[in-house]
A protein has these predicted regions:
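Edge beta-strands of extracellular beta-sandwich domains
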Residues: 2-5, 435-447, 550-559
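Short, solvent-exposed loop/turn segments enriched in Ser/Thr/Gly
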Residues: 465-471, 538
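Short aromatic-acidic-glycine turn motif
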Residues: 11, 451-453, 493-510, 562-564
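Substrate-binding clefts and catalytic carboxylate motifs of secreted carbohydrate-active enzymes
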Residues: 128-130, 153-157, 164-466, 478-482
Length: 564
């Protein structure tokens, strides 16, 4: 048996922060679920490799597994590519969040689960931290705090080289102490389906309870995490952890850093809109070692947490608020993160979709924009939209076809402009305090005639039954400029048995379409198809077609012969 491993050192303290190989390291983190979009819940090595590479290219240097231990394929990819990992054991402890959830077996199984996670992670240098759970209200009670300390000690007995944290939702803990938002069973639990038509529970609890009230309260819950009750909740659980993980409680950072100089903190779950405030505190306080935004990559479930339009009539399918959508496309919010982190040096320019001009979206709390970096909206001339510029500059000037639309001060790394669509060039010019140009970016309208553009990420696969070919499918003009208003059916035909279609879909949040059919509508001009190698040598020809465009064909070869 051959086992790969890595060697590196970890140190952590309130005075030094987190040190990796003796160097202070700030975690530019994102939370990810285990699913792989159009592939569903399956973990393929090629899918994890692609996902981690895209995340790394966008500036992330750390991932939090939400909310279960990572697959070996994902950890292998993180080891190779260089991505830190906070591996998380549980989404809940012994208090149910749903009727038929793991809480029913937690007390009998948690030690074996922790042991399995640590033994799986031990030789993976990418894993730098363990998390015991997510938004578990047990941490508000004495029994839960004692259990947390016991689990921490269990992990330390298996691996004393990595710190232990837990994602504490302070506001949920405050409510739990008041008996609010906690799941309760009035009858004995039965391991059988409830009668047809009967709900498992009538009231939201746990994370679902928090998500509901986060939408209602908005910025108010930021304030509620900084009360005396909240202070007590954090104070009591802190000794049971090496690093205190705080979910949506950045209002505590300044006071806790001053009052508890030896207490390490990490933003285990935050909103992207809050990053200017949060990252400023990460840079200011040694004890605050990083920030993990929700979520780095979009996922199936917890539907419609972003911006959605009523004109899409399908069933809710995706969360719809990820910094990167399920096809692997980085969105405007991702550019905002790069700007705040300082990894993006030029201003970023995006506009809200003109094919929905006049519609009012339902705005989820976890997404602050649905803008995209395109100025190609044929058929929507004269329609109003909002242009958004993300930058570290003092102010921004917006120009359309060399005419000044306006100049605005930058607030929280953003400047917004009202503008009406006209084909041509939309430009954002970043200015310093003396109004000297420090950078610029522009969006140029594409031509009207659509073509299908198909981009396979590889043309040769090994015959292992696991290798994947990812194919981006877009409606563009002849120069490759995306036509984001093109939302129509695309069909896929495969000739030859070398590969099969493993998944095909778009990033549309609400849809009645599924990922297993050889046809799907594009969303924002785009879809993703994934082909899986068989176990025998051969070649397949794939043809992609759509109405009013020329079909496009390409080949995928499956062979055991290595490419030269």
């Amino acid at each position: 048996m051959t086992e790969k491993f890595g060697i590196r050192t970890l140190e952590w303290s309130g005075k030094t922060g987190l040190l990796v190989n003796g160097k202070e390291t700030l975690l530019r983190g994102g939370c990810i679920h285990h699913d792989n979009g159009v592939l569903g819940a399956c973990s393929f090595a090629d899918a994890e490799e692609r996902r981690v590479r895209i995340l790394k290219s966008q500036g992330f240097n750390a991932l939090r597994m939400a909310h279960n231990p990572a697959s070996r394929s994902l950890l292998d990819a993180c080891d190779r590519i260089g991505m830190y990992v906070m591996d998380e054991a549980f989404d809940g402890w012994y208090i149910p969040k749903e009727y038929h959830d793991y809480s029913r077996d937690f007390l009998s199984d948690y030690k074996s689960v922790l042991t399995a996670m640590v033994e799986n992670d031990y030789n993976h240098p990418s894993v730098i931290m363990y998390s015991l759970g997510n938004e578990v209200t047990e941490t508000a009670a004495k029994r839960g705090i004692e259990l947390c300390a016991e689990m921490r000690d269990t992990v330390h007995s298996l691996d004393g080289t990595r710190p232990v944290t837990c994602g504490i939702n302070v506001l949920l803990d405050v409510y739990a102490r008041l008996g609010i938002g906690v799941y309760s069973d009035k009858k004995e639990y039965k391991r059988e389906p409830l009668p047809e038509g009967k709900g498992y529970k009538e009231k939201k609890s746990g994370s679902a309870f928090f998500n509901y009230w986060a939408e209602k309260l908005g910025k108010l819950f930021f304030v509620l995490s900084d009360t005396r009750l909240a202070e007590k909740a954090v104070r009591d659980i802190s000794p049971a952890l090496d690093i205190v993980g705080l979910n949506y409680a950045s209002s505590r950072y300044d006071k806790d850093a001053e009052k508890y100089p030896d207490r390490l903190m990490i933003g285990t779950e935050t909103m992207s809109a809050d990053l200017p405030y949060n990252w400023n505190r990460v840079l200011r306080h040694k004890q605050l070692i990083g920030d993990f935004v929700w979520s780095a990559w979009d996922y199936i479930g917890e539907t419609c947490m972003g911006w959605t339009y009523q004109s899409y009539k399908g069933l809710p399918l995706l969360s719809g608020q990820g910094m990167i959508d399920i096809t692997g496309l980085p969105l405007a919010q991702m550019a905002f993160l790069r700007t705040v982190w300082g990894t993006e040096t030029e201003p970023f320019l995006a506009v809200r979709p003109l094919n929905h001009s006049g519609e009012t979206p339902s705005k989820g709390a976890w997404q602050f924009t649905n803008a995209l970096d395109s100025w190609t909206w044929h058929g929507f001339e004269g329609k109003p939209t909002v242009a958004e510029v993300y930058t570290t500059a003092d102010s921004v000037r917006l120009e359309l076809n060399d005419k000044v639309i306006g100049t605005k001060k930058v607030r929280q790394n953003k400047a917004l402009f009202s503008v009406k669509y006209a084909p041509g060039t939309l430009a954002a010019i970043a200015l310093d305090r003396s109004e000297n140009e420090t950078g610029r970016t522009r969006l140029i309208s594409g031509e009207k005639a659509p073509i299908l553009t198909v981009r396979p990420d590889r043309s040769v696969l090994p015959p292992d039954g696991q290798a994947l070919c990812f194919v981006e499918i877009e409606f563009t003009d002849k120069n490759g400029v995306l036509l984001p208003y093109m939302e129509q059916r695309v069909d896929i035909k495969i000739d030859g048995n070398a590969v099969t279609l493993q998944g095909f879909g778009s990033a549309l949040t609400k849809t009645d379409e599924v990922f297993i059919h050889p046809y799907h509508n594009t969303y924002r001009g785009r879809a993703l198809a994934v082909f899986r190698a068989g176990k025998a040598d051969g070649k397949s020809t794939v043809t992609v077609s759509s109405e009013n465009t020329e079909p496009v064909s390409f080949s995928i070869e499956v062979t055991g012969r290595k490419e030269e």
